[in-house]
Amino acid sequence: MISVIFALSVAQLFLGMADLLQRGVRVRFFLAHSLWVINLFLLTFLHWWSLWTFRELSWNFGMFFYGLIGPSLMFFACTMISPRNTTTNDVDLSDYFLRIRKWFLSIFAVLLVFFSFDGPLFGTEPLLNELRIVQLSIVAISIFGIFSTNRRFHTAASVGVLLILCIGVFIRFLPGQ
């Protein structure tokens, strides 16, 4: 079920982008928006892959329910990131992103908190490890973004999140980890 929700999340990202391109409207792209799409795509696969460590666990309903919360929030964030059913001939992704940023970044911060605690709650990793710095950094950037309407900040923040996610990949998935 968790994998299905992640697959639907990725499908939402693809559908959102394809919808913009197929409709024949003039799209004004915004680097921060494009990078957030990439960040969501990357985080979806990273978290899905990290769930491999739970394969030997004896699951109960509470664990399963908790395990569904993060992917469900991810699906919601992936659905929200791209405009749907626009009635105008012009789509400005900068304006759109700034309009949804409070909800989007709030959901993103909360889903990262849920992702941060599944390993410690399920007993597969300690509460404090190198990944918490990565996760807390992204949560902090998201919280700052909720309150900022500065386009440059959001571009820098989306680049920062991408770089931090890449650092997290090296921490989490290096051989021997």
For every predicted segment, state its role.
Residues 167-177:
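Juxtamembrane boundary at the C-terminal end of a transmembrane helix
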Residues 1-9, 176-177:
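Hydrophobic transmembrane alpha-helical segments in integral membrane proteins
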Residues 114-115, 137-145, 162-165:
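Hydrophobic, membrane-inserted alpha-helices
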Residues 31-54:
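A generic, lipid-embedded transmembrane alpha helix
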Residues 67-136:
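Membrane-proximal helix-loop-helix units in multi-pass membrane proteins
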Residues 35-36, 155-167:
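Central hydrophobic cores of alpha-helical transmembrane segments
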Residues 19-33, 55-59, 87-97, 146-157:
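Membrane-interface helix-boundary motifs at transmembrane edges
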Residues 1-4, 57-75:
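Alpha-helical transmembrane segments
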